[in-house]
Amino acid sequence: MSETDESRITTNEAPAATPPKAAARKAAPGKRAVKKAAPKKTAAKKAASKKTASKKAPRKAATRKPAAKPASVLIVGAGFAGLGMAIRLKKAGIEDFVILERGDDVGGTWRDNTYPGAACDIPSNLYSFSFAPNPNWSHSYSGGAEILDYIHYLVSAFGLREHIRFQHNVTALDFDARRGLWTAELEGREPLRARAAVMAQGPLSNASFPDIDGVEDYQGKKIHSARWDHDYDFTGKRVAVIGTGASAVQIIPELVEKVRSLKVFQRTPAWVIPRPDFRTPDWNKTLFRALPASQRAVREALYWTHETMAMAVIWNSPLTRLAERLARRHLRRQVTDDWMRRQLTPDFRIGCKRVLVSNDYYPALRKDNTQLITWPIAKLSENGIRTADGVEHELDCVVFATGFDVPKSGTPFPVRGRAGRELGEEWARGAQAYKSINVAGYPNLFFLFGPNSGPGHNSALVYMEAQLDYALRGVHRLLDDNLKLLDVKPTVQARHNKQLQKRLARTNWNSGCKSWYLTEDGFNATMFPGFATQYRAQMATFEDGDYDSEPR
């Protein structure tokens, strides 16, 4: 994670922990620590045990159904969101929870995205939990492997591994209104029940492939950025990259140094701004470890700097024009060819699509072995890609840097609420929720990174922490008051979303370009139309009057 094997993350609030890699060696994933042997029974106790033995139920075999008693909370997903929720529950004294993870390790998008150059476009000191700071980040913008190490640290430091069930793929969630329980149907396993369910699988979990004819016909190597094949040797190969989004601008500079030729197929150019990345000096790490308040001050400064950026990317303001001028200057400095510069200049307002951060993307496109192709792709043939101008591009490998299928509508699996309601059907034209967390008709269910919780300018983890606190308040209300149902009122949800969409209509996201923020009908179910400070204020209070409840 950091520069030496001996270095490790430290935090004021988290318990001391072995460094992530060492911790992983101490216990296999999903296994509990071995308990000490119980003390021997006295003769009197043995006699008492014999008298009551006939009354006790026989011990169930390991292969039989789990105990009937449901868990308090069931969490779907072991990425940042799911682990963050688990930490909040543990710190609140709620230990009876289980995390269901379809993969064989934690990490979510950072476990899956291991392509060359994978990194975060938010500064490391802001892309981490405020309650578990890492003083040992190696760079101001850390790579994916280092972020994954941080996630493993969270599991170790907060004792989460015993709660995680790996290779547990949820295929459906069903609510039993009579008992007030959610049942998780699992692929090839017995179902699990809980009083509350938390959907924490995140929006960036399912790889998206473009709708192009002939994908199955192509006989060469196919690699998706979210399913990278590290065994494939790119040396001397003729390679194509489809897409010029966030993953592509990181992959292209890495591949260009290895391949014989690189063809970049661009549908729409993006706004690209410089990335102020630098190596963290040792004295800086020492200062953060010795004086944690100094790191908190840096985090606070980064937070407010990014809050200022909201004026540029969310709404059309003088700062928007300034941001566009800075992006154009970045392009002019790095690309001298007039034709290429025109092809790389967007025709939409900055912020309408995701703004990219890179220092080496433009220089990579100028390499002698790189070709930028802006003709639409007609189809994939057996040997390569055919573009709309009739040119056949013969290739050894096609890289799909086409991101994720972000759920703006529907659900990743059936979610059935009260009275036979099915969430996928209700969200078919666009997802809606109350404060991005709760959905009317689906009691005791909490979403993390739910509808309209996306940040356009600040750290996703800032938004996530606000969601964790709000969801925890709901779980506390449910458990502490021994409720069977806790369900947001439909009128409250409708009023909230009416105001939300009215505000979204005035944002750059809704200014006319096509992006993954919007549904095909132009409905924005993804982004929050405001500052992170406004989002946090919205999530700071849990109004009991906004919810219907029913006691057990």
Language model features by range: what are they?
Residues 139-205, 379:
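Feature captures the FAD/FMN-dependent oxidoreductase FAD-binding
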Residues 18-63, 67:
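Low-complexity, polybasic segments enriched for Lys interleaved with small residues
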Residues 397, 401-475:
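Glycine/threonine-rich phosphate-binding loop and adjacent beta-strand/alpha-helix elements that clamp
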